[in-house]
Every structure is written in structure tokens, then in C-alpha cells.
Amino acid sequence: MPESLIAGIPVHFPFEPYPVQRAYMEKVIHCLRDGTNGVLESPTGTGKTLSLLCSSLAWIRTRQSEHQKQMVKMEKADFSGLGGGAPGGDLSELAKTMGRANNWGVPKVIYASRTHSQLTQAMRELKRTAYANMRSVVLGSRDQLCIHPEVMREQGNSNKTNMCKLRVHSKTCSFQMRVESRKDHPDLRGPTIMDIEDLVKVGQRLKICPYFASRELVPQADITFMPYNYLLDPKARKANKIELGNTIVILDEAHNIEKICEESASVQIKSSDVAMAIEDVTHIMQVFASGESQDMAGDEPKDFTLDDLTLLKEMLLELEKAIDAIVVDNAVDGTTFPASMMYELLGKANFTYGNVATIVSLLDKLVQYLLVASQQMSIRKGGTFTLLSDLLTIVFANKEDVMSKVYASFKVHVLVEESKQGHGKQQGAKQQGGWLGKGTIAAATGLSKVAKIINFWCFNPGFGMEQLLNTQVRSVILTSGTLAPLKPLIAELAIPVAQHLENPHIVDQSQVYVKIIGTGPDRQQLISNYANRDNPKYISSLGQTILNVARIVPDGLLVFFPSYPMLNKCVDAWQASGLWADISCKKPIFLEPRSKDQFTSTMEEFYQAIRDSKGAVFMAVCRGKVSEGLDFADRNGRAVIITGLPFPPLKDPKVILKRRYLEANRTRENQLLSGQEWYNLDATRAVNQAIGRVIRHRNDYGAILLCDSRFKDASQVQQLSKWIRGHLGDRPQCSPFGPIVRELRQFFKNAEANMKLPDERETDSPLETVCKTEDEPLAAIPKVKREPGSNATFKSANESAIKVEMANSIKTWTPADYASAAGHKLGGAAPNAMDFMSRLDSNVSSIDFNCCTDSKSGSSGLVKIHKRERSSPTAPESSSQVTKKRYKLVENIKVEPSSSQAKEAPEERAAFLRELRSLVTQDQFRRFGKALLEYKNGTYESFQALMAILLDVLSAPKVRYMLVGMRKYLKNEHKDEFDRRVGNL
């Protein structure tokens, strides 16, 4: 691949980078080099993801090379001064080496995005770069990765998580138990980048748990992909053992990062949750009293006592009483209280900083107990205990010494909880009563008149970012296609930012047509504000506008509404008036559904309709699935209509409190937005995201029509993406509808005449079309002549890998594309896929689809090879199968103690430390280094501390040789005890 020198770092890029891509990569490298943070905006379609991955991994690779040279230099320097040496000299030199090496660690990259489909897109981008052989792993949830049939039958993520924990704890999950012995299998450690689906397939083939196997890959990975919540939620970081020290954190698609940070620090609890928790505790107590617990859980000792349950029930009863005593002045909108009220509320039930850890531990144990019990009787599985655990964890997450900041950033909002079965006191008593009714304070005193919902809301996203920075990360890079304006974003997140960028678009001015349409064909004003949205004349004029545009725009037309109610209102009116039928005559209409299953089928039908000469219309809402994630490149989206500004609900309590928070904390120094500016920006960012569904690559073209007269206001224009503002000019005005129709028709006529048609591959399958890259310019990819039947073969091979949910991911990268980007000249036919894979690295053949055949062999040969690999290891071998035979032997080797003992630890200190670092986690290596330095000048107690760490880290059979190798570095008086303790393993 072409190499470019960017900011002093050689970067391999699939093609010669455009100026906007070079500018972007320079900013990234400056951040990594200097250990600073960056906020970088680059429009969708400019190659942002590709630039981000190539620049960051190029810098990592350069650092790895420098690190290796330093280690060799240090090793030579250390041994040049060694002679005989006094006893203990080895220990002193090892400690000295350890101290230096600890500061030399090469940073690793954590790439986080909002959804797994976005992560899959990034991983597919990585596959087509020169950095595809760098070690990578993706972290997913149990819901996505678990393959245990019993666990997968559970409903809801929480139940699956708890059932998984139970089976792991009780050692009844064979998939998890095989991970340790098979975690080094070539299929798992091979050079191929594996996304979620690949991990599941490997797990099923090896009969190991993909969830825990992926965690084993993290310590050695150069780049780890994960969703936001794994990174920003302290609970998730702890549960997944994610270490952030000296890491580079990349937050892609970060336009919603403020909301995500706020939501990760917010929590909700209901009166009904507390009542059900009391019910569940009482049930467990009755089981204990009756002796049934032995039958339910066998002879295993309980992790809690009846006294623990009694104390917990008393606390929950007091909490219920305290919640019942809250006075809600406004039954409709609720009542707001200061943050201190939450601590006072929990304090009345004796939940404090001093005991919260113990209570959370007890709640987690009760969840495990109920999961076992639920297998034998019809009871709840402890979901309310999980809710209470989350409440206590989040409320008490901040240390007591920062409470003044907590009080300024949080609010408590109490709402009336509606009864699911009816209204009134009697119905409420029925809902919370049952066999438990006589045991609750509510029933005994009649205090509980109205059930309530307690919201603990965070309005300061800086909390989440501050916790992230406190983990000693090297750099944090926030990036998206729609971050502007940058200053208020940086101010709200409260992070020091050294590098910032607002990139222009990669396309030419002639490829985009942007207009503000202030009136419809009937000269009715188009404005979707509160006063006008019910106006029948406005709704009719908007429909006429869409009809006229649909007559002109070829292929796909996207129409975004501010909300689902507004979408439904327009649809009903147009169906009644006949406008719906008129539009449908021009193009079939598809509506964005809310359910996942319907969404998938609707998208498939839309892409199928695009292949028709008439195209199709897709009507969706801003902030919906379509506006946030999907790629409508080329024919899929030739124009987008924005029907209005999607402002948040003005009277929503959370919106009101957010605006108040900004007004109360805004100063000239911190540059926070005013409440009204934030309100406007929230709407405009959603518009920017919707606009980003079209113009997805260098040779794409399309029209953007803003059908709301408010878009001409300076306050709205300034919040649009920079590249869109460039098309509107300094003083944008609403254009008359007639001239717009003529200009729009001429625009598409010119574009179709002058622009290159999309690659024919994009029209082969509607699902393949959506998976096309947004980054690679089509000019860099020559057309590939397809052999008869090749499309059917391709579709069959990739059918399970391409899904509508991942429609924003890139099109599968083919051998022809790789050869083109790498500078190879292709002949008339596309290269054989297996021959292509063999060229990636001739020395690597660790996964079955890396097996190569002669380029003359057809697809039938490929099928036969796969069948031989899986069912007949003794089948005759060709030259290309020798590697696979060696691979099968590796797979069948069992992990035995003798195999690890036969291996010896490196004699040289630097080599010893290098190998140790590669075998343990960063945290384990840090603990080892600290204990070793203390042992050097310490006492017998320091030896015991060192031994504890050594046995914890190096006692496993596969690494025990390193434990044995530590003997030479110990003091003579401790070697006998070391031998005895190691011998007992």
C-alpha cells in the first residue's frame, strides 16, 4: 500500500490520502505523540474511520519498533558491566531493569463507538489496511456472545448475565471451562480480525465461550473495540477488567457523548421495585425458615444468613416508608428536589458510604440464589435486587470529598408511578400485596397512598469524562461527522483539548445541492413549530412539496420528520386526502418501524425497491435508527428532505432541568452554552446526523432540502455542519419553490451526465449496497468483471455476514479491491479468493479459511478442502495443505503440566522481563514490579508479598516455567521456601 510521511510517522494508506484525510491524520498523530486530547470533526464520507485507524496504528507500530530497539540497547548496556557479581547482584540488576522497563510500555488503542454495527464497520475498514495483521479484539455482551443454550433461553440481558455468572461460579458451563486450555488455539489467536459474528463461529467450532475467550485476547491486543458503555461506565469497566492506564481512547461517533456520559451517571428506582424486593426477601426468609433451601440448593453453604436477610428487609421497609412520605406537589409533571435529597432518603434506611459495598455484595448473592431457585419453582429471578444494586452503586460512586460538585450537577425528580392494572388505593394495594401484604409497612400503616418513581439525574457530562481521565489514559480523541460547535462541547466535557479540527467535505461543490425551502408549491409557509404543526394547510403543502421532489429525484429519497407523532399525523392526513397515493405512484413509500424485526424486513424491502427504476421514498424520524446509523450511498439516497427541527419536548422535566443547570453554571470563563442555545443545538445536531446519511464517498452526489423556514435564522445556520454552511452562503434565504424545482432537475441532469456511475457491484444485492464503504473513493477501485454465477457464489458465502442492522458498515472488501489498493495490476479475471488470502502472509495459516489452493482451482475445490479439514485429518495432502496438517496437530495438543515444565525461562534479565510482560496483564506486571522493588531492600514480609503475587500470576501450568525461572533472582535465604511452595503446586 502507498506510504505517506505524516507528522514524521510513515503511514500506510490504501490510496494516496486526500488533503482532508492528511490533515485529520496529522491531528491524530500530534495527540498520540504529545499525550494530549483532541476533538476532531470530519464529515461523513471523508474517510474519517479509515484515517483514524491508519494514523493511530501507524504511530503504535512506530513506537513498538522504537521500544524493541530500546530494549536491545538496554540489554547490551546491562550485560556489558556484568562480571561475577556478588550474591543478590542478579536481583539488583533485575530490579533496575524492571524500573526502566515499566516506563517504556507501548500504549494500546481502545476504539469505542455507540453500537456494535459501527464497531463492525470499523473492523471491516481495518481489514483492508496494511495494519490488518496487528492484534485486535472486540468486546461484546453475553447477549451477543454466549453460546450456552440454557443461558440463551433466558429473557433479557440482566437474566442472561446473572445466569452466566451462576454457571461460571458453579462450574457448570463447559464452554467457559474450556477457555483456559484452548485460549491459544490458532483459530483464536490467528492474524484474522474477528468481529462479533466471527467470535461466535470460532467459539461454536472450538466449543469454547466467545465471551470469556475475547477477554483473554485483550492483554495482548494492540487495539480493542468496544461499545461506549464498557468504557464510560465504571461498573462495566470493573466487570470487564478494562485497564486504561497508558491507553489511547478513541470515541468515534461522539456527537452524543454528552448524553451518554450523563445517562451513565443517572439512575431510576420505583416504589414497585422496592415493594417487589421486599417480597423477594420475605420469600427467601420463608424458604430458609421452612428448610426448603437445602432442597433448592443442595448441600452448598449459603453466602448469606437469615440475619443478613432480616437486616436487609428492615432497611428496605424503611426505604419504602421514606419514599411513601415524599410529597409530590404536581402529579402530572412531578416534583424536583436537590441532589442531597437522595442521600437523605437512603440515609433514612441506613444506606451509607460505610455499608454500601456490603449491601451491594449481598444483593448480588441474592440474585444468584434466586436464579438457582427459579429453576425449581415459579418465582422472580432477582431483577429488583439488580436495580437496587445499580442504584446504590451509582449514587455512591462519587467520593464524599466531591459532594459539593455532586449537589451542583445532579437533581432528584419524583414522578407519580401509574398503576399497570388500574387506578386508586385498592388497586395499588392489590398490586403490592399478595401473600406479602401483611408484612409491609404500607399495608400496616396505610402510608402508601401513591406509588412513585425516583429519578437521580446527572446534568454534567464532565463527571464521566473526569473519571475516564483519572484512569491515567494517554490520550482521548473525540471524533464524529457532527461535533460542531466545538467550544461548548469541550466546555461541557471539561477536558483539556490541544488539538481540534473542523474538516471540509471531500466532495466538490457541484456534487451537492443545498437549499432552504420556506414555502410549498401553494406558497404556504413551511414551518414545523408548535403553533403550526396541526395546521391542515401546512401538512398539505408539505405533502405537495414531497410529491414534486419525488418526481424529480432519481432512485432513493429520504424524508426525516421531527418526531414519530408528527410523522404519523402527516401520514394520516395524506392518506385521507389522496396525496399518499399520488406519492406512491411516483415511488413506493416505506415508513420507519420501531420494532427491530419489522425494521430489518422494511429495510430489505426498501433496498429491493431501489433496484426498480422508480426508486423509493423512506420516511423516518430524526434521532431514529435510520438517521443515526444507516448508509444510503449512491442510488440508495440521492436526496434528503428535512421537514422540521427536532427540538426536545419543551416541557419535559429533564429538558427543563438541563436548561436550568446550564444557566446556573454558565460563566464567561467556562464558555458553556445558555439553556436556549443548548436547546437549539440539540435539534440541529440531530439534523446534521440525518443529513449525513447521503454523500457517503468522494464520487457520491445528492440534494439536501431543508423544508422549514427557520433554517434561514442565523442561530440555526451557525449550528449546521461547516461544509453545509459553505453551500448556503453567508446570508442564506428561503428560495421560491418554482426556481428550486428547475435547479433541482438541472442538478441531477448534470450529475448523471458528468459523475461516474456507481460500481456495478453495488447493485448486485440490496444488502451489499448498504455495506459499501463511505470512505474509499470509487476512482481507486477498478471495475471487476464478474464471471457467470459469481454473484450467486458471493452472496451464498457472505449471506450470514451481511445484516441490515449493520447497514452502515462497508461493503465486503474483495481480492480485486485489495490488489488495486496495493498497486497490483489485475488481469481480465478477478483473482482467486483463496490465492488472495495466501498473499497476506505466506507464513501464517492458522484459521481454516486461510488454507490456500492453486489459483486454477475453483470453488468446488475450496469446499472439498473445508470438508477434509473438519472431518478427515488423514486425507491426502497437497502442498498447500501441509500447513493445515500442522495446524490440526496444534489444535489437538492438550495442555499438560509437563509441556510447560519442559520450557525454560530466558536467562537474560531483559528477555525474561519481555516474556513476562507478554504473558501477564499490565496490572499484574505493575504489581510484580512494585513487589520486586520492595523485596530488593525489604524484609521477610516483602518476600511473602512477592511470593503471593508470583503464585497468583505464574502458577498456571502454561506459565509455571517463568515462576521457576524467578528462583535465580531471589535471596539465598528464601530459595528453600520458594522451592517448597513451588513444589506443592
Swiss-Prot record:
Residues 872-882 have a biased composition (Polar residues). It is an enzyme of class 5 (isomerase). ATP binds at S42, P43, T44, G45, T46, G47, K48, T49. Disruption phenotype: In males, RNAi-mediated knockdown in germ cells results in loss of male germline stem cells (GSCs) at day 14, appearance of branched fusomes and down regulation of a number of genes including Stat92E expression in adult testes. In females, RNAi-mediated knockdown in germ cells results in a decrease in germline stem cells in the germaria. RNAi-mediated knockdown in somatic cells or in differentiating spermatogonia does not affect GSC number in larval and adult testes or female germaria. PROSITE patterns: HELICASE_ATP_BIND_2. Pfam families: ARCH_RTEL1, DEAD_2, Helicase_C_2. The modification Phosphothreonine is found at T874. A motif (DEAH box) lies at residues 252-255. Residues 7-303 form the Helicase ATP-binding domain. Changing G81D: In strain: ZW104. Its EC number is 5.6.2.-. GO terms for cellular component: chromosome; nucleus. Its main location: nucleus. [4Fe-4S] cluster binds at C146, C164, C173, C209. Belongs to the helicase family. RAD3/XPD subfamily. This is Regulator of telomere elongation helicase 1 homolog. The lineage of its organism: Eukaryota, Metazoa, Ecdysozoa, Arthropoda, Hexapoda. The gene is Rtel1.
